[in-house]
Amino acid sequence: SGGPPAFRWFVRGLGRLVVANRPADAALIESRVSDGRGLLADDGVSISNLFSGDAPTSLLTMSGLKEGRAGLGPSQSYAAFFTHPAGILRAVILTVGEVGKELFQARRQVRRRVEPRIHRGGAYVALRAATNVFLRDLNVALVVEAMMRGSTSIYVDFVDYDEIAHHAGVTRAESLAAFYGLDDALRSIEQVIESGVAPRHYEVVLVSDHGQSQGATFRQRYGHSLEELIRQHLDDGQSVAAATNDVEAWGPVNLLLGQLSRQDSVSGRLTKRVISDRDPEAPVAPRGADAKRSAGDDDAPADLTVVGSGNLGGVWFSQHGTRLTAEDIEALHPGLLGVLAAHPGIGFVVVMTGSGPVALGAAGTHDLTTGVVVGQDPLAPFGPDAVGDFVHVSTFANAPDIYVNSLYDPVLDEVAAFEELVGCHGGLGGWQTRPLLVHPAGWSVDADLLDERGRLHGADTVHRQLVRWLERLGHRQDLTPDAVAPVPLPVSLPTGE
């Protein structure tokens, strides 16, 4: 199995990090996983997504941003928004207002001594305005335009709440206020549906693939990062490449800049001028977003690569072409696993042994293959899905040599992100593992897709349910039905094994 173990991960066969919202990497992932039967394969439209879902029309879709591909979509799809005062002028005014709102709300958190909190300044101010206003309005305009063309299905990603909650907190006033903007977006779409002006009737399905968990970051709590903790227990001269800065949020901005630079308009020419000295495929990102070396020869591959995805960390021994076992790691770096497992900010680590994956905690171990627990079960605070989830991700060919999950405080319902984000997702603990699926009341959920607790568990299962709903609506008639189709293959990237 070769599924992505995180939002960004080290691919042994490539000898580098792969990041899902980098255009070249998104295109690589999609080329390996696509079987031509994606969710949007039947005359669908992808808007503001990482991947196209095999849609014939892709707008602001990351996997199509790579030069030479048509995934950005036809220029006429954007013309009305960028040329009509009701579109661009309104968005610009509200975007400027959002900048002022963020500056005020960030200072208010400081004055009121709201904790936990992080610094909210610099590029994030513009990032919030772009994602919470400008892109939202553009997305709505593109959805309505696709509806007026009679497209069979439309899949759009709104990142408003997610982005603000990362920086302000999960239940903070400004984060929750983002839902008003989403309500307005949905209302605009529903008004078009109810008016009957579109050539076909549409139904709306809402999907949130994760929640968010809150807490002071790992660095705020202990004065050092995960990478620095590991580096303290390496031999002198060994190098660590760390990628623990937030890069997820910059994907939508890169999509917007990529599309603007391709427009034959005033805004397009201005964008080209601003980014003229940049590689057109190079993503815009905050300083330090890429993996940074902490020691050693800059020209040689790092000995270790440490990645943070929310409160889930991944550690790869980069110079080894195969995944190391716990026994290998102990021989190379005696005591490192014990140091990580015993750290108060770490709930557990998962490593592969000669007999399968094992979770190690400060006071016990859990064999994920046999279920045998010695001492205190380190997975107990993380819920009944923890074992199955880590059994699954441990099978990924490019899984890290060491998975690291932060602490979880069940009283405060808090975790400790390895990125500098007060709200996070990626690991276990708290609300981040609570997704959402809202569908028309008249649609039924297929019993054969439910797990033993009556849930649609996992992205693959939700995808299959969405496909079946489309089939019941009369779509995908030229494609193999889900019930008899082969299970999609996981992402297959070089492993070096």
Annotated model-derived regions:
Residues 80, 87, 146, 163-166, ...:
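A structural signal for the main folded, soluble domain(s) of proteins
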Residues 121-129, 164-175, 212, 444-452:
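Glycine- and acidic
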Residues 133-134, 154, 161-204, 228-238, ...:
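A long, amphipathic alpha-helix that forms part
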Residues 64-68, 169-176, 217-230, 322, ...:
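Short secondary-structure boundary/capping segments
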Residues 58-61, 164-166, 214-216, 223-229, ...:
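Short helix/loop capping segments that flank catalytic or ligand/cofactor-binding pockets
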Residues 1-152, 157-169, 307-317, 321-324, ...:
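His/Asp/Glu-rich, glycine-adjacent segments
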Residues 17-43, 47-55, 65, 247-465, ...:
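Active-site neighborhoods of enzymes that stabilize oxyanions during catalysis
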Residues 185-223, 358-361, 365-366:
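Metal-dependent active-site segment of extracytoplasmic phospho-/sulfohydrolases and closely related
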